[in-house]
Structures are given as C-alpha cells and as structure tokens.
Swiss-Prot record:
The gene is csrA. Keywords: Bacterial flagellum biogenesis, Cytoplasm, Repressor, RNA-binding, Translation regulation. A translational regulator that binds mRNA to regulate translation initiation and/or mRNA stability. Usually binds in the 5'-UTR at or near the Shine-Dalgarno sequence preventing ribosome-binding, thus repressing translation. Its main target seems to be the major flagellin gene, while its function is anatagonized by FliW. HAMAP family: CsrA. GO terms for biological process: bacterial-type flagellum organization; mRNA catabolic process; negative regulation of translational initiation; regulation of bacterial-type flagellum assembly; regulation of carbohydrate metabolic process. Gene3D superfamilies: Translational regulator CsrA. Belongs to the CsrA/RsmA family. GO terms for cellular component: cytosol. One of its GO terms (molecular function) is mRNA 5'-UTR binding. Homodimer; the beta-strands of each monomer intercalate to form a hydrophobic core, while the alpha-helices form wings that extend away from the core. It is found in: Cytoplasm. This is Translational regulator CsrA. The keyword Repressor applies.
Amino acid sequence: MLVISRKKDEAVLIGDNIEVKVVGVDGNNIKLAISAPNNISILRKEIYEKVKNENIKATNKNIKILKSLK
C-alpha cells in the first residue's frame, strides 16, 4: 500500500484517467473530489462492505428456503 501526504488542493493521479484531489480539511475530516470515467465504480468502503454482507445473508436465507422445499 502506498501512503502519501497531500495538502488542500493537491491531487494524486491513478493511471491516466483517475484523479483524487483534496478539496477540504476540517479536523479529522478530509473531503476528496474524485474524477474518473463513468465505467469506474467509486464506492465508500463501509457502504460496500455492508451491502456485500447483506447480500451474503440474503443468499444464505434463500439457500435454506430452497433446501426446505425438497
């Protein structure tokens, strides 16, 4: 994992077409602006993990229901 420091209005490029820019700093909160092509998904990790876990739970429930129908 690469760890770097950036100040307000400084940016990082990822590949040729993704830019992550620091647009604000307020105490422990950092506001980022991300520019990327439309085909690139940009997700907050905590939301992604929550949705993934809920999908796994739903799948497990569906498997149990299907097995009970045999």
